[in-house]
From Swiss-Prot:
Expressed only in the epidermal cells on both sides of the leaf and not in internal leaf tissues. It comes from Kalanchoe daigremontiana (Devil's backbone). GO terms for cellular component: lipid droplet. PFTB repeats lie at residues 148-189, 640-681. The keyword Repeat applies. This is Lupeol synthase. The keyword Isomerase applies. NCBIfam families: squalene_cyclas.
């Protein structure tokens, strides 16, 4: 049986940490764990997901939950409550529902204080890892038989009815998702006609019916070229010489959004070397299986710009194609021949590897994310197959693997801090500290230990890195990458804890550490008042014309976001209250400009586009809470009034809200099919309305939403998993498995604290 291990570094000599592995979560298979009852529960969960896989794509993340609840012998003792139609939502009912959820969720806390959870969903994360291990000869050593079977399970369970695989688990079939998962199945041992429900042959049919693998998007062409399944001449140029350009030029990689930069970095190294894996009999078979014409007859030059229509989200502008054609026809032929291949290309490759090693070391070989992880690992192996750099990469592979009832997948890189910061705020809002003091103290300890204590090493500005001392990452301290909203949410938690009794929640964070966090936030605000996520924005907008991907938007440069801005405004308003003299004018100016940004980016219909959650509901929650924190109210701010009207106009008959992920790529509000409600989105909308003062005007919409949340709670205090609610780069969805607990609890807590108590006080008067 698989077991989740917490804060465990194991005995691998090639792994190192900054804080004793706090936040690390890895799965290990325990052959001795053979309890028949537990095995039966796991198998039942798998079968239930399989039979409902076309109705509900995200899993319920049950395996670790079963493990933790069993280890803690948790039993729900508080009776379930229901609020009948026409019945008033009483203080007692909401308290009972909240307490049931809080007790269950507290039992799900890990020993180091964080809340584990799956953070995955894209169908292109795992296949490159399998390809890399196959190329390097480590597939059998890293992927045991149990790893293989669970990885194949995930592929089988998320195959679409038409035989293909999507860009993400809820998406329509794409060439990118289908080709990568087809290759993955074959590398893991499935034959051309193998796989559950004829998965392999059905996948191959989809590929051939849609034009074959030559129409895979550009990232796919890169991986196929690495594998020897395409020729590098079928790829657009990715010259590593860009790293040699003067840094003041606008197209220098240092000006790129960090994720774009980190992907381009190892890709350009592999492209510059024209690295191709050893051609094995399996590779020769795959060449015959995924192309519609013989491999040696494909005109690779003609397929460079070809992309399957099912994959196309962001068509390349003509200007970009002209740039690639110029580099392809003139620059590359020169740089790959003597003497320039010795004078320039060799130096460019060395510079690129210098950056790769720097980023690897400063993230403890986790790297910034899973796409980059695999590419950097492969680049290190290409440079030195027996080197320590590659061995350090191997040691961190378990950090990315996650198992649930739908199988094993690769995570984005883990959402440990992000989920925990929200969880803490939800629990604090419940006002049940006397019941969950130990839980809060452990969570506080995790937050404090997860703060980044130093800037990146050495001349970090010369390596195009920003300050990180005092920040929080999305996952854990070892990851190292500062994120503005993660920093703001971590700072909020520490400030809230500092207002509580230390004998209950532990010692407060030192003021100097809080100041470091404030410094990070202040350093990131743009001239327009908004906040980017990772690094200061400011590169020219026209660089987005060079977006080389066909399935993402806004990936070339850093941009400002409503969520990051709101989180930072909320954190600094609370900080100013507790530390009114520290950098007072800068903090006040930040809050004023941040609030103005939130007003300025509101859509004409009163909504805000959510960049990291689905979508306008998510954006509205953040915007309204941020504006409220800055002193904006329904009476003095038109943006608040329009935002409230937007949410009220889309409330459903059952009292909830439900928004389709299609809102994200379409950039317009799209309701869920059949006007279904989603409990996470209902919670976002409810909290947004609460902070906008809806109770003072008409609390009925709030009562209806609270009734839906209470009545939807399950017998054990959990909430049902529903549609996917996370997103990145507008077109790829992300499954935040903890959201189904965090946000209904948080919304009920705020409702109880701000609406029910207010109502009770009014009655007494």
């Amino acid at each position: 049986m698989w077991k989740l291990k917490i804060a465990d570094g194991g005995s691998n000599p090639y792994i190192f940490t900054t804080n004793n592995f706090v936040g690390r979560q890895i799965w290990e298979f325990d052959p001795q764990a053979t309890d028949p009852q537990q095995l039966a529960k796991v198998e039942a969960a798998r079968l239930d997901f399989y039979h409902n896989r076309y109705k509900l794509k995200p899993n319920s993340d049950l395996l670790w939950r079963m493990q933790f609840l069993e280890e803690k012998a948790f039993t729900q003792t508080i009776p379930q409550v229901k609020v009948e139609d026409g019945e008033e939502v009483s203080y007692e009912a909401v308290t009972a529902a909240l307490r049931r959820g809080v007790h269950l969720y507290s039992a799900l806390q890990a020993s180091d204080g964080h809340w584990p959870a799956e953070n995955a969903g894209p169908m292109f994360f795992m296949p490159p890892m399998v390809m890399c291990l196959y190329i390097t000869g480590h597939l059998n050593a890293i992927f045991t038989e149990e790893h293989r079977s669970e990885t194949l399970r995930y592929i089988y369970y998320h195959q679409n009815e038409d035989g293909g695989w999507g860009f993400h688990i809820e998406g329509h079939s794409t060439m990118f998702g289908t080709v990568l998962n087809y290759i993955c199945m074959r590398l893991l041992g499935e034959g051309p006609e193998g796989g559950q429900d004829n998965a392999v042959s059905r996948g191959r049919k989809w590929i051939l019916d849609h034009g074959g693998a030559t129409s895979i998007p550009s990232w796919g062409k890169t991986w196929l070229s690495i594998m020897g399944l395409c020729d590098w001449s079928g790829c657009n140029p990715m010259p590593p010489e860009f790293w040699l350009l003067p840094s003041y030029l606008p197209m220098h990689p240092g000006k790129m959004w960090c994720y774009c930069r980190m992907v381009y970095m190892p890709m350009s190294y592999l492209y510059g070397k024209r690295f191709t894996a050893r051609i094995t009999p399996l590779i020769l078979q795959l060449r015959e299986e995924i192309h519609i014409q013989p491999y040696d007859q494909i005109d690779w030059k003609k397929v460079r710009h070809v992309c399957c229509k099912e994959d196309m989200y962001y068509p390349h502008p003509l200007l970009q194609d002209l740039l690639w054609d110029t580099l392809y026809l003139t620059t590359e032929p020169l740089l790959t021949r003597w003497p320039l291949n010795k004078l320039i290309r060799k130096r460019a490759l060395q510079t690129t590897m210098k950056h790769i090693h720097y980023e690897d070391e400063n993230s403890r070989y986790i790297t910034i994310g899973c796409v980059e992880k695999v590419l950097c690992m492969l680049a290190c192996w290409v440079e030195d197959p027996n080197g320590d750099y590659f061995k350090k990469h191997l040691a961190r592979i378990p950090d990315y693997l996650w198992i649930a009832e739908d199988g094993m997948k690769m995570q984005s890189f883990g959402s440990q801090h992000w989920d925990t910061a929200f969880s803490i705020q939800a629990l604090l809002a419940s006002n049940m500290a006397e019941e969950i003091g130990i839980t809060l103290a452990k969570g506080h300890d995790f937050i404090k230990k997860s703060q980044v204590k130093d800037n990146p090493s050495g001349d970090f500005k010369g390596m195009y890195r920003h300050i990180s001392k005092g920040a929080w990452t999305f996952s854990d301290q070892d990851h190292g990458w500062q994120v503005s909203d993660c920093t703001a949410e971590g700072l909020k938690c520490c400030l809230l804890f500092s207002m509580m009794q230390p004998e209950v929640v532990g010692e407060s964070m030192a003021p100097e550490s809080l100041y470091n966090s404030v410094n990070v936030l202040l350093s990131l605000q743009s001239q327009n008042g908004g906040l980017p996520a990772w690094e200061p924005a400011g590169a020219p907008e026209w660089l987005e014309l060079l977006n080389p991907t066909e399935f993402f938007e806004n990936i070339v440069i850093e941009h400002e976001y409503v969520e990051c801005t709101s989180s930072a405004v909320q954190a600094l308003v609370l900080f100013k209250k507790l530390y009114p003299l520290h950098r007072r004018k800068e903090v006040e100016r930040f809050i004023t400009n941040g609030a103005k940004y939130l007003e300025d980016i509101q859509m004409p219909d009163g909504s805000w586009y959510g960049n990291w959650g689905v979508c306008f509901t998510y954006g509205a929650w953040f915007a309204l809470e941020g504006l409220s924190a800055a002193g904006k109210t329904y009476n003095n701010c038109a943006a608040v009034r329009k935002g409230v009207d937007f949410l009220l106009n889309i409330q459903l008959e059952d009292g909830g809200w439900g928004e389709s992920y299609q809102s994200c790529p379409d950039k317009k509000y799209v309701p869920l099919e059949d006007n279904r409600s989603n409990l996470v989105q209902t919670s976002w909308a409810l909290m947004g309305l609460i902070y906008a003062g809806q109770a003072d005007r008409d609390p009925t919409p709030l009562h209806r939403a609270a009734q839906l949340l209470i009545n939807s709670q399950l017998e054990d205090g959990d909430f049902p998993q529903q549609e996917i609610t996370g997103v990145f780069q507008r077109n790829c969805m992300l499954h935040y498995a903890a959201y189904r607990n965090i946000f209904p609890l948080w919304a009920l807590a705020e409702y109880r604290r701000q609406i029910q108590l207010h109502s009770e006080a009014t009655k007494m008067v």
